[in-house]
């Protein structure tokens, strides 16, 4: 355990940030999974609706620094290509 007061504060802050990041990543996975399931089902309308939600979550996660902005762009691009192939 840390002995310095500021280190103790950082441990708590880092834990809160970690929990927040895990929650954001979990939401991302859920949104992307919903989009991929709609694509697999061949339902273009549902896939586009799910993509809109997933793209918004990816952009927010990238803006918050949870994922890199290039990773968000690559994931959005991959989903868009799959939807356009329907």
From Swiss-Prot:
This is Small ribosomal subunit protein bS20. GO terms for biological process: translation. It comes from Bifidobacterium longum subsp. infantis (strain ATCC 15697 / DSM 20088 / JCM 1222 / NCTC 11817 / S12). Belongs to the bacterial ribosomal protein bS20 family. GO terms for molecular function: small ribosomal subunit rRNA binding; structural constituent of ribosome. GO terms for cellular component: cytosol; small ribosomal subunit. Binds directly to 16S ribosomal RNA. Keywords: Ribonucleoprotein, Ribosomal protein, RNA-binding, rRNA-binding. Disulfide bonds: none annotated. The lineage of its organism: Bacteria, Bacillati, Actinomycetota, Actinomycetes, Bifidobacteriales.
